[in-house]
Amino acid sequence: MPRYKLTIEYDGGPFCGWQYQDNGPSVQGALEAAVKAICGDAVRVHGAGRTDAGVHALAQVAHCDIAKHFAPNRLRDGLNAHLRPHPIGVLTAEIVPDTFEARFSALRRHYVYRIANRRANLAIDVGHVWRVPRPLDTLAMHAAAQRLIGKHDFTTFRDTECQAKSPEKTLDQLDVVRNGDTVTIVTSARSFLHSQVRSMVGSLVWVGHGRWSADDLSNALAERRREACGPVAPPDGLYLVRVDY
């Protein structure tokens, strides 16, 4: 039975997240329905990142085992045909060894968070960036962000419903870059806790507004209490952009 690796992009706005939820449609569910329409069997599609409701992906990775053999390009095209009502695109399909696991074989996950730092309302990017009207000091944000690099207990920056066994994660990158009125936060790690990226982004925005200093961010991390976190950024601006293997 061949195992297929899929690289997928999607607009997370209409979905309750990657994973099955009782409260609405999921990306996983839409993909599995498309696979079933092609091969006739119920097949589980496993994703590398369980993105939350409203979070987007430019290159989510998934794998599935299909009893019938398909040429990878034919599988890709067939899935896209059945996914057409949804804002989901299968970019590539390839046959991989059966030892490959989209989630557990991943070496690093890369996310980008986009902020529109402007007074004007959004006309084009509604649902795809976080509009922050007050000016942000991105140099202060970037400097403070470096306090979070490395291995830490990120209890402060994880959702209270996070199911990870340990709150310890190693953060490899957290950069804040401005290009005009667009502020981009780039982060990478082998894995992240539930809501960790959005929690870090919201706290960095407090730094950008001058409400917190870099020391305040460090102190919040050290407290290891969810209540010590700043605001949680909305999902609109968050994108899973790459998974390394």
Curated annotation (Swiss-Prot):
The gene is truA. Belongs to the tRNA pseudouridine synthase TruA family. NCBIfam families: hisT_truA. GO terms for molecular function: RNA binding; tRNA pseudouridine(38-40) synthase activity. It catalyses: uridine(38/39/40) in tRNA = pseudouridine(38/39/40) in tRNA. It holds the Pfam family PseudoU_synth_1. Keywords: Isomerase, tRNA processing. Substrate binds at Y111. It comes from Nitrobacter hamburgensis (strain DSM 10229 / NCIMB 13809 / X14). Homodimer. This is tRNA pseudouridine synthase A. Formation of pseudouridine at positions 38, 39 and 40 in the anticodon stem and loop of transfer RNAs.
